Amino acid sequence: MRLTPSLISCLSLLHFTSALVAFPGAEGFGANAVGGRQGVVYVVSNLNDSGEGSLRDAVSQPGRIVVFSVGGVIEITDRIVVSKQVTILGQTAPGDGITVYGNGWSFSNADDAIVRYIRIRMGKGGSSGKDAMGIADGKNMIFDHVSVSWGRDETFSINGDVSNVTIQNSIIAQGLETHSCGGLMQTDGGVSLFRNLYIDNKTRNPKVKGVNEFTNNVIYNWGGGGGYIAGGSDGESNVNVIGNYFISGLDTSVTAFTRGNENFHAYVETNYYDSDKDGTLNGSELGVDSTNYGGMDLVTEKYDYPAVASVLSPDDALTYVTKYAGASKVRDSVDTQLVAQVESYGKDGALISDEADMGGAGDLDQGTTPTDTDGDGIPDDAEAELGTDPNTADSMDLDTSGYTFLEVWANSLVPSSYA
């Protein structure tokens, strides 16, 4: 029996309730991730690879909200493995925020992860054949304003028994040659991709199989392997592809959509493609015809998946992504270069095999560690504004909103919407 859009929608929404969203502005399949809200606070107080006060130690145990009293580059040798029910709030770091450089991260079985405003840059010294970020199993995760780059296999991939994941407002960039892949998004459990930038990946921008919502993304300078690739024909896929902008770059030699088949069912609407590499943004809408979408089976009814609150036009999506995607509280040198490539509209961009071509991870202002008398993760001056006690560790108490006071403070540091 072929699954209809309405049946797929019912199945996919069984999990989706009116529960508190992960943070104001959380959307999609992963919007209800809980993170470490029912656990304890852990303050990352140094840039060490391991040991007390390190980020690696912070995420090694379940049930933690992780905040930062220091900014800068954390250089790691081995992969970081994240436990269940962990919230990582990179926007709390002083200075220019946090970059983690040198190897990748595993979120396999990291149920209920919430990750915001952090840069994960693997690099050629990372583990061979591994992703910069990967999820092989797990459920209920959301990644917001994450900048991930330089994977040695995929840059950000989701495979296996995975359900209810959102990647939003993020940058997935420069998988290293010779593989150079944006990532696989291959699960029947539901993945939402909203307002992201895929850039300088030879292929898999992304490669999709299963249940997927792909809305208001920008894809720039994919190589000969392909832009948005439809997954294999050995199983059913049911996707929405809405309001995206594809822009050819110097390395682009194939069309935006490839490898469609009769089992890849897609609802498509208002997707733009600028293919001429002339330095001017002048894309046009792809007609709703299977030949424009790599031979996908196009359906007329949109799958009723958890959607964005407001769908942008492709032009507005491009403006949004170039202004705000990635760890954009403070843009580092890498993301600044990547956005400049997009805004060259075909005249700049490169597939790379060595992050040195981008200047490496770069330098970050570490900022000044704020005074936190009770050590509960909220600086004293912020406690005064919140009405909490700077002499009592009360940051994990619940506010009337349902969030912990720690989350309320962290959420106040960044906009919930950029509309």
Swiss-Prot record:
It is an enzyme of class 4 (lyase). Binds 1 Ca(2+) ion per subunit. Residues 352-395 are annotated as: Disordered. Residues 363-372 have a biased composition (Low complexity). Ca(2+) binds at residues 274, 276, 278, 280, 285. The keyword Iron-sulfur does not apply. GO terms for molecular function: metal ion binding; pectate lyase activity. GO terms for cellular component: extracellular region. Keywords: Calcium, Carbohydrate metabolism, Cell wall biogenesis/degradation, Glycoprotein, Lyase, Metal-binding, Polysaccharide degradation, Secreted, Signal. Glycans are attached at residues 48, 164, 201, 282. It catalyses: Eliminative cleavage of (1->4)-alpha-D-galacturonan to give oligosaccharides with 4-deoxy-alpha-D-galact-4-enuronosyl groups at their non-reducing ends. This is Probable pectate lyase C. It comes from Aspergillus oryzae (strain ATCC 42149 / RIB 40). The gene is plyC.
